[in-house]
Amino acid sequence: MKKIFLIPAILFLSFATAGATEQDTVNRCAAIIHDFRRMPERAIPRDVLRHARGLAIISVFKAGFIFTGKGGHGVVVARTRHGWSGPSFIATGGAGWGLQAGAQVTDYVIVLNNNGAVRAFSRGGNVTIGADVSAAAGPLGRTAKGAVAPTAAVYTYSKSKGLFAGVSLEGAVIGTQRDSNFRYYGRPVRADEILSAIAPPPPGAAPLRRALSR
């Protein structure tokens, strides 16, 4: 029975990401950053972004009825001496039980507040939020407390149906997409090479880097 209900969710998630290229993912992440910057009084405080050592940006598709499936793709970037790094591709996914029908898309921004958080994503494996890096729901608004003196290695934010929120992502597992990095950079490249800017950002990363630098 569980497999019967899970199949529609898996099919939806497959169709939702089918045909999406790495450049599509980068463009989507640039649009997410624009959205989060557009209403600073309701979204991520400017000081949080100004002091960030890196950002993980991901869109998660969730669908199903009774049994739900979810999956998401995105990128992580780091601040270097020469500006923002190129994107290293990441993904998350899973299945669970819930009284939910239909489909939902939620955009997440994970602010990497220190170099330790950047190193966790640079290892090129899986990062478990709350275990590999301490996490807290991020402060919201222009005058939010914690904007200058972070209380956790990462702050987590979400936007769904136009509503911004600081959210808990405790237990979420995010993994490096080595195949996507290979396709985007045209050669085998490690996450640490990307996030340290040893691997130069491809021209297609320019819109995302501009969005981050505003």
At which residue positions do the language-model features occur?
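Positively charged n-region of N-terminal signal peptides that target proteins for export
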Residues: 1-4
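Hydrophobic h-region of N-terminal signal peptides that target proteins for export
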Residues: 9-18
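Small-residue-enriched, tightly packed secondary-structure blocks
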Residues: 20-214
